[in-house]
Design a protein with these regions (language model features):
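Metal-dependent phosphohydrolase cores
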Residues: 1-114
Length: 114
């Protein structure tokens, strides 16, 4: 049986001070402020770009494109949040992610609660 110190060690602390279980996230622990903060500091393409381009900016650009095309508010929101799990998990490039089904499972859990 795990002691309390081991259980607490399995949580990540967010920008706002929330404790989030990175394997079994709970909706009440997810805050838009934490998502926005983290994504604004995460670079797209694992940093393999000529200049810093944040995941947050990518999501905003996707949402702007959806608005320009006349898509519904629901689609615009989906564009804003499509990479939200990356605020809690490191992004993996698709060619690697396909070899890590457990990672995909955990990412799907985050997307479900977000």
């Amino acid at each position: 049986m795990l002691g309390m110190e081991n259980i607490l060690a399995n949580y990540m602390k967010t920008y706002t001070g929330r404790k989030v279980d990175p394997v079994n996230p709970a909706a009440e622990d997810i805050l838009l402020e934490d998502i926005a903060h983290a994504l604004s500091l995460n670079c797209r393409g694992n940093g393999q770009v000529t200049h810093f381009y944040s995941v947050a900016q990518h999501c905003i650009n996707a949402a702007k494109e959806a608005i320009a095309r006349g898509y519904s508010d629901k689609v615009v929101l989906a564009c804003l949040l499509h990479d939200a799990s990356e605020a809690y998990l490191t992004d993996l490039i698709r060619p690697v992610k396909i070899y890590m089904p457990k990672y995909q499972e955990i990412e799907d859990r985050f997307l479900a609660v977000i």
